[in-house]
Amino acid sequence: GGYAEFTLADERYCFSLPDNYADAEAAPLLCAGLIGYRALVAAGEAKRIGIYGFGAAAHIVAQVARWQGREIYAFTKPGDADGQNFARELGAVWAGDSSAAPPQELDAAILFAPVGALIPQALRHSARGGTVVCAGIHMSDVPQFPYSILWGERSLRSIANLTRSDGEAFLDIAPKAGVKTEVETFPLTSANEALERLRAGTLRGAAVLMIG
């Protein structure tokens, strides 16, 4: 992160970006994509994956998961028909409100939406042995839930950081998987507008702030 035009960094902690992405298209790969990929790895070999919150990270992860032959079930905030249609365009086999039940039990779920109340819902929709991965930095409080929805060797975990090997693997996979980032650019002076659009859930894909 950061908006300096020039910086000095240890090359051991830098990644080479794929050549076939313009700067704005590559920008979402470096946060949303990297953390999203680590969350996907944390989901293990799950075949049916639920994604709660279909924004910047989700629209990238969905493409990688589909390339890997997995099924994506997308959950958006209630009434977000545009977000659900976007998920279907990217290959989701089902898309619906976060309050809805998917047509099949999930092997894993990834939560990008910072809503603690979604954790019990994701657990209820997960098969025995399933994993629920919380990929956000912040989340509202998780409500009390019965042990029975965690029982059955279901697991609940969070994602906080990524490793260099995660980054190298993802940036190698992204062009092979044909990942296309959908971005809306804003000048840096319109950062507050971009944040408001993000909060309102009216962005399709990712917002990218341009310095120049």
Language model: regions and residue ranges:
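C-terminal hydrophobic helical "lid"/dimerization subdomain
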Residues: 120, 164-212
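Glycine-rich phosphate/adenylate-binding loop and adjacent beta-alpha elements
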Residues: 1-14
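Terminal helix/beta-alpha structural elements that buttress the NAD(P)+-binding lobe
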Residues: 48, 60, 70-71, 83, ...
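Glycine-rich cofactor phosphate-binding loops and adjacent beta1-alpha1 units
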Residues: 43, 73, 81-155
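Short strand-turn motif at the edge of the Rossmann-like AdoMet-binding core
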Residues: 135-139, 159-162, 186
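Mid-domain Rossmann-like dinucleotide-binding core that forms the NAD(H)/NADP(H) cofactor-binding site
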Residues: 19-99, 103
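Structural detector of well-ordered beta-strand residues that form the stable sheet scaffold
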Residues: 15, 50, 73, 131-133, ...
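Short beta-strand/turn micro-motifs composed of small residues
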Residues: 53, 76, 113, 136, ...
